[in-house]
Amino acid sequence: MSDKRQDYISWDEYFMAVAKLAGMRSKDPNTQVGACIVSEDNKILSMGYNGFPRGCSDNEFPWAREGEMLDTKYVYTVHSELNAILNFRGGSLEGAKLYVSLFPCNECAKAIIQSGIRTVIYDCDKYSGTDPVIASKKMLDAAGVKYRKYEPTNRELIITV
């Protein structure tokens, strides 16, 4: 009888890697965010990434970050967390975990809370001092949704496709 392999990746590494891989589908030239929703028994339920709604051309809608509001991406983009929630096609997300590469904004926090997701594991919190993230944390705390920073292992995962 042989011993099992010891260098397999942890659940956290696996799901955060899946979230980051999903983010690689984003066509946003500045910000690629991915999300992966996982059941209490570690089954992937849904994934999402930031981008425009279905039917809204990536070539016709703006990717700009500055300018008149209607000439920027901000009023058109669906965030990865909301896409993952909307992409879920079965049952309930009650008790699920959300792995996401960037801390959720206030609008995504509302959807997270309403969907029943109970835990958020995030990689980056670079907007922590902004009103949307402060509001997000306030709502998540009030609703009893736990959140924690992903602890990177700096393990290099190489995938050839």
What are these regions (language model features)?
Residues M1-V161:
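Zinc-dependent deaminase catalytic domain
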